[in-house]
Amino acid sequence: MAMRVDQTCGSEEHSPASTQRSAQLFADACAVIPGGVNSPVRAFNSVGGTPRFITSAGGYWLTDADGNRYIDLVCSWGPMLLGHAHPAVVEAVRKVAEHGLSFGAPTPSETELAAEIIDRVAPVEMMRFVNSGTEATMSAIRLARGFTGRAKIVKFSGCYHGHSDALLADAGSGVATLGLPSSPGVTGAAAADTIVIPYNNVAAVEDVFAHFGDEIACVISEASPGNMGTVPPLPGFNAALRRITAEHGALLILDEVMTGFRVSRSGWYGLDPVEADLLTFGKVMSGGLPAAAFGGRTEVMSRLAPLGPVYQAGTLSGNPVAMAAGLTTLRHADDAVYAKLDANADRLAGLLTGALTEAGVAHQVQRAGNMLSVFFTDAPVHDFAAAKATETWRFPPFFHALLERGVYPPCSAFETWFVSAALDDDAFARIAEALPAAARAAAAATPEGTA
């Protein structure tokens, strides 16, 4: 059963008096920004209450405009794996900024970061930097079409690849949170060449290629989806995508905007080394600043302008501040950091399982490396249909019970939880103290209570 979506701006249902400043800031924002936010999931529409306006962060702590502090289990939706305001990253950004923010010209740091990524991810032989994950996937799709001379693309229900028109069809992330099948403004023509099939279903992939094989330019999939909740590929699924696309002369694009350099030094490729033709990156690779990238084998990437005819450009692409933040983050994310991230995810998953089991709540804590999600169901979730069928109405009271006790989880049942390497024993003690009440709130929830 899907949760109710509250489309109002500034609901006070779950907002204690200590959020008065955030409430005022939200009201001010609603007057000049649609919905008061610049990315829909931030509006708390699916959980109710007032979005917390964050004014500072350090390590694993977030501080809001009212002075409330929260243990951060969102990490800016993934990038802050070292923790907030890591001294080395801050210093690198400061040093670069002193010499200028953007030049509209090549800089050495672009080549350095590209070389670092190429060294980590074997299928990537050349890179192009852009400004967002949406740009990365949109550009990769254009390149795949230009390379193959074909028009159709295949994506999976619940996989989110940014908000370009062709990729919004049956997407996850905010589209799932808002209960929208796509988006008004996406024309039939824009989506006509997008084929959407169930995730983790090899037979569906084979069937669509049997019908449209010589028309399909590419298959795009999240390397391990995190935008319908954490729903990892079944063993061999990505390898099957590689096999089927190769058999039909189509390209395989694996979207690692979320998983790239988050789940391992080499991203999801380090855990499941399937050699895609193109990969997309973002979040961690830019250290939390606006930058992303796509890359792949030279034969494909050399079709990009100015070498080839496929056009792609960006005024701020490869800006030196984001390059410095990304390069410093990657160089500090050594094996010890990834071991700490995995251990922290293990610890959080154990606390979640223990509290929810004690409260008698049917649940699944699903993992993809150090990424995880909580689904309120007694069966594993392998696709978007199963994710939408979970008891999502238990999530709002669960979320608010944690928030009111100083723990900041994702504000949607369809988003992934992220840990940082900064989390320590004190943080986990506080999380452990908050979870029993949250689990009891989930247990007491009813569909009518959040309808």
Swiss-Prot record:
Gene3D superfamilies: Aspartate Aminotransferase, domain 1, Type I PLP-dependent aspartate aminotransferase-like (Major domain). The keyword Cytoplasm applies. Its EC number is 5.4.3.8. The modification N6-(pyridoxal phosphate)lysine is found at K283. Its cofactor is pyridoxal 5'-phosphate. GO terms for molecular function: glutamate-1-semialdehyde 2,1-aminomutase activity; pyridoxal phosphate binding; transaminase activity. GO terms for cellular component: cytoplasm. It is found in: Cytoplasm. GO terms for biological process: protoporphyrinogen IX biosynthetic process. It catalyses: (S)-4-amino-5-oxopentanoate = 5-aminolevulinate. HAMAP family: HemL_aminotrans_3. Homodimer. This is Glutamate-1-semialdehyde 2,1-aminomutase. It comes from Mycolicibacterium smegmatis (strain ATCC 700084 / mc(2)155). The gene is hemL.
